[in-house]
Amino acid sequence: MAVQQNKKSPSKRGMHRSHDALTAPALSVDSTTGEVHRPHHISPNGMYRGRKVVKAKGE
């Protein structure tokens, strides 16, 4: 088991944890359908950047 050499100060501990905060996922709106999707991903209906690229389920 690893044992620390020196105690980490509260300041250094806080600096270490500074990038641990959760962020909300970025969302884009499709210009054609107005549907919300993740950037650089196709929307649920199979559209990407105004073009139909994949057949949606049930089509």
Curated annotation (Swiss-Prot):
GO cellular component: cytosolic large ribosomal subunit
Native source species: Neisseria meningitidis serogroup B (strain ATCC BAA-335 / MC58)
Disordered: annotated segments: 1-59
Compositional bias of kind Basic residues: 49-59
Keyword tags: Ribonucleoprotein, Ribosomal protein
A GO term, aspect molecular function: structural constituent of ribosome
GO biological process: translation
Lineage of origin: Bacteria, Pseudomonadati, Pseudomonadota, Betaproteobacteria, Neisseriales
Coiled coil among keywords: no
Protein's name according to its UniProt entry: Large ribosomal subunit protein bL32
Family: Belongs to the bacterial ribosomal protein bL32 family.
Matching SUPFAM superfamilies: Zn-binding ribosomal proteins (SSF57829)
Presence of keyword Ribosomal protein: yes
